[in-house]
Structure formats: C-alpha cells, structure tokens
Amino acid sequence: MSTATYDLVLSGVIYDGTGAKPFEGYVGVTGETITYVGKEKITGKENIAAPAISAGFIDIHTHSDLSMALDGRCESKLFQGVTTDVSGNCAFGPVPINRERMAEHTAHLQGMDFTGGGYQESDISWSDLDGYRATLEKRGIAQNNAP
C-alpha cells in the first residue's frame, strides 16, 4: 500500500480512455491534479467508492456557449460527465455578435432563464471572440471551453 497522502481517492472500475479494458483500481488526487491511477490500494483524506471512473467527456457540438457565459456553473453538463464543450460551430452562436443580431438572440432566448432574473440584452457585453473569452475568464466557468 502506498504511503503517499492524497486529498481525494476514488475507487471503482476505471475506464482510462486509452481503449484498454476497464479495471478495478484507484485514482488519487492532490490539490486539483490527478497524481495516481492504478491498482495498488491507496487512501486519502477523503475516500469515495464510485461504480465507474472515467476521464471527462468532450461535447463536440454544443449550444451552451451563451448559457456558459451567463451562468458558469455548467451543472447540466457536469452532471453528465462533460468537462469540455466545443462551441461556436453553428450559425447561431454568441460570437461575433452585434446590435443588429441582438434582437435575434433576444427572441430566441426569451424563454431561457440563465441568471435567475431572466435573460437580458445587457447580459451580453462582448462583440468578438476576445471579448467572449474575457467574459468567460472574468465570470468563471466550471468547464473547459473550446470556441
């Protein structure tokens, strides 16, 4: 048994994403970094038994680019195991956006409630990719985003 100290240890069937067969094992996390994956039993400050453990999934065609910018918790994606969104691959995306397109966005998103107070035109402060990225950085998001 390893004598290393981990902040978090997950135990369960590991699907490592390499195409190898899944195996019973342990994942050790120190801080925000995975520092151990293997079959040797390890323990940590917090130990969680999980039915299955895998790398985060990538959603390669998503429409959450606006919701991500307005509510960075990304809960619906994270609960599904999606840790990275590839966005902006449709004609209806938040970048580039200008005042002429704002009415189109407002009409499309009117029924959505990202912030608890309803969708407002003033929620969008950017017009280009750099501004969108700066907004994500400033507001903070719980997922990776590849626009």
In which residue ranges do the predicted regions lie?
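Divalent-metal coordination cores built from histidine and acidic residues
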Residues: 70-147
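Generic low-polarity alpha-helical segments
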Residues: 14, 27-29, 47, 53, ...
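A generic fold-level signal
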Residues: 21-22, 52, 140
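N-terminal metal-binding scaffold of metallo-dependent hydrolase/deaminase domains
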Residues: 1-43
